[in-house]
Amino acid sequence: MEQQQPQQQNDGQQQQQQQQQHQQQQQQQQQQQQQQQQSEQERIYNKKQEHLPLLQTVEELVEELRRSLIVVEEFQTPSQQLLFDKLNKIINLYEKIESNRHIVNDVEIPLEIFRVIDQSKNPDLYVKETLQNCLSANEKTKGKIESIKNFKKELESHISESFASEYAEYKLLTQKKETQEQQNDDQIKVDDSNNNNNNNNNNNYNNNNNNNNNNINNN
């Protein structure tokens, strides 16, 4: 009986240490997730800034097409020069868009968007419906995950009470495995970050070269 009490105390201390280590790991994971989210937000912002000039050109082209359509529908002989000017401007805008097409080479557009546009519907509604469907699916998945987590906690609680020493040994082995996996994941993230930085540097270099070539051609 006296031997069992120290053994139970040791098991209790091990469980406390494991819980503390688990909490520390969770905090580290949360910090890493926050850093990843911040990096992703910065990447998206930089990408939007990169696409902004092209987007403005497209908007300008759409507006010129609209105005040209009005001129054509109400065409009169004195407005011929105005129509020529607008056509020349439209051509220049198309050329400008074509010269910057490399900026959006990595942009993927779902084909369903074009079907929506062909039906004279607002593509923003398609985006809204898609996001709503994703949110609904995520909520269902989240509910399933929470149920599994609660079941796991309840099961571990009963096992730790019934098989204290075996459970402590199991947690120790699991802790070692999680630590090794975390180290491997961290190394992979570092490698991916280095590769992304190299790719961004190469893209910036190519963009600068293209801009220089465009400036030379314009001159």
Curated annotation (Swiss-Prot):
**Could you say which residues form the signal peptide?**
none
* Cystine pairings recorded for this chain: none
Compositional bias (Low complexity): 1-39, 194-219
**Compartments where located:** Nucleus
* Coiled-coil parts of chain: 13-74, 166-219
Gene Ontology MF: a single term: transcription coregulator activity
- Keyword annotations from UniProtKB, A to Z: Activator, Coiled coil, Nucleus, Transcription, Transcription regulation
Q: Name one GO cellular component term.
A: mediator complex
GO BP annotation list: positive regulation of transcription by RNA polymerase II
Which portions of the sequence form the region Disordered? 1-42, 177-219
Q: Basic and acidic residues bias located where?
A: 177-192
Q: What does this protein do?
A: Component of the Mediator complex, a coactivator involved in the regulated transcription of nearly all RNA polymerase II-dependent genes. Mediator functions as a bridge to convey information from gene-specific regulatory proteins to the basal RNA polymerase II transcription machinery. Mediator is recruited to promoters by direct interactions with regulatory proteins and serves as a scaffold for the assembly of a functional preinitiation complex with RNA polymerase II and the general transcription factors.
> Subunit structure, per the record?
Component of the Mediator complex.
Please give the family membership noted in the entry: Belongs to the Mediator complex subunit 10 family.
Family annotation (PANTHER family): PROTEIN MTL1-RELATED
Q: What is this protein called?
A: Putative mediator of RNA polymerase II transcription subunit 10
